[in-house]
Amino acid sequence: IYDRLVGSEMCIRDSLSKEPLAAAVRDNDDDWKDVVEWVWFGMVTAEEMSITSDNYATADTSVPAVDRLLNSNLGLGTEANPLPDTWMQSVLSSVGNYGEAYDNSFCDGTYDGHSGSAAMTGCVLDRAGTDNALVSEGGLQFAPPMR
């Protein structure tokens, strides 16, 4: 079951079972669940669009899909405490898109955020060719339209 030893930590195979898992949040807090889900969707969408922590501020917002990603509240948050329209810009500036966050967690942190899973190096958990890759790369990671 163990794939490799990294320092004093054991890394198990990246696929122990095939089941759709998602971020877990407490019951009875649909507003928070929506925020967590859409942060994930936004990170995946940003990587699909090659929008990274380095280039989000100069992304072409004349493209409607890019503008929705970077400048739309999407009705998230609560009536008393809605998210700002630039919430996804805050996510990107903090952790980057999905590929950047994956690389910083499981690889050497040098991924450019848009060249695809195969460009990631020094990974303790490879993403290329696994369920963790984007759908466009044969993986399972996708996001609905940012609407």
Outline where the language-model segments fall.
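C-terminal capping/gating helix-and-loop segments adjacent to ligand/active sites or protein-protein/ligand interfaces
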Residues: 93-123
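Extended ligand-binding regions for polar small-molecule ligands
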Residues: 13-88, 97, 113, 130, ...
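Low-complexity, intrinsically disordered Gly/Pro/Thr-rich segments
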Residues: 123-129
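Functionally constrained cores in energy, signaling, and assembly domains
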Residues: 2-3, 23, 105
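Short, flexible coil/turn micro-motifs enriched in small/turn-prone residues
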Residues: 2, 133-134
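Single conserved hydrophobic/aromatic residue that forms the stacking wall/gate
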Residues: 1-12
